[in-house]
Each structure stands twice: as structure tokens, then as C-alpha cells.
């Protein structure tokens, strides 16, 4: 019942425009979910602001496993602060593209469930708290075994 939107993909604007052109034709209006992407594509924050997350060209360079490992390192706060910048920008980009959303109605998910990695989860919840956002939904790992 929702559409996941990845703000940092090259087709983002094209997808937003496609949705806008077709939205009146939908039988029901889907909810929009921010699909955080910290593993692929280009950082919205820019290489100069998140140098430990991206390569020289601004493409994400860390794997799921590396992010998990970083969660337990003494240097985790350095990474967490950079993750916060990227997470905040990705959420704001989606909300700006869909003004009918509010920060109280946002739904949050992530590519490969990275938002459940400890350092990423800490960054996400700090951003939510600092911005005083009240998400409607944050996906967790409790998935139904059967669809019915």
C-alpha cells in the first residue's frame, strides 16, 4: 500500500514526475515511503561532507557488513555524524518532492534494511528526535510469515 522512493538515485526526478502525471488514475492513493539508500548511488550530502561513506566521486563505498562492523568501533560516532547528514537530506528530499507528506506522516524503510544496523539506527533516531519528526511508520524485521 505504499511506494518506496529512493532520493539519491539518478531517476528520482523522473519518477516523481511520472507519479504526478499518473496519480489521478490510481484506484487508491498509495502512501509514500522514504527508502533510505546508504549503499548504492551518489550521496546527497556530497563527498566533502561524508568522506568516510563515499569514494572520490561521491558514490557510496561501504557494504552492509562494513556498516555493521563500524557499529562496534570506537570511531562509530564519526560515521554516525556523517550518516545523520545523509539520512536527513534523503528524508527532506522526498518530503520536498511530495509536499502532501508531512514529517508526521513519513514512512521510513531502507535499502537492504540498513536502518536496522546499530550505527545507522542511532543516526536515524537522532535525526528524527533533533528534527522533532513523528514518522507514521518505520519498517522493522517483524514480517508476517504468511500474507493472510
Model-identified regions with their sequence ranges:
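Active-site gating loops and adjacent loop-to-helix segments of metal-dependent hydrolytic enzymes
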Residues: 42-78
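Catalytic domains of cell-wall/extracellular-matrix polysaccharide-remodeling enzymes
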Residues: 90-148
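Acidic (Asp/Glu)-rich catalytic clusters
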Residues: 13-33, 48, 52-58, 95-101, ...
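Acidic-and-aromatic substrate-binding clefts and catalytic sites of carbohydrate-active enzymes
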Residues: 5-15, 39-45, 111-119, 146-147
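Hydrophobic faces of well-ordered beta-strands that scaffold small-molecule active sites
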Residues: 3-5, 30-36, 106-110, 138-140
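Hydrophobic alpha-helical segments and helix pairs
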Residues: 67-107
Amino acid at each position: 500500500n505504499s511506494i518506496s522512493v529512493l532520493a539519491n538515485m539518478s531517476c528520482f526526478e523522473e519518477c516523481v514526475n511520472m507519479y504526478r502525471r499518473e496519480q489521478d488514475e490510481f484506484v487508491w492513493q498509495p502512501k509514500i515511503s522514504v527508502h533510505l539508500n546508504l549503499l548504492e548511488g551518489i550521496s546527497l550530502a556530497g563527498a566533502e561532507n561524508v568522506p568516510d561513506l563515499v569514494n572520490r566521486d561521491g558514490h557510496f563505498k561501504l557494504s552492509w557488513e562494513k556498516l555493521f562492523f563500524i557499529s562496534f568501533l570506537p570511531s562509530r560516532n564519526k560515521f554516525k555524524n556523517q550518516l545523520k547528514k545523509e539520512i536527513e537530506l534523503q528524508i527532506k528530499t522526498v518530503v520536498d518532492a511530495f509536499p502532501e507528506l508531512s514529517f508526521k506522516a513519513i514512512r521510513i524503510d531502507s535499502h537492504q534494511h540498513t536502518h536496522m544496523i546499530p550505527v545507522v539506527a542511532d543516526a536515524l533516531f537522532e535525526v528524527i528526535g533533533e528534527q522533532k519528526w513523528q514518522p507514521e511508520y518505520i519498517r522493522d524485521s517483524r514480517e508476517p510469515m504468511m500474507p493472510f
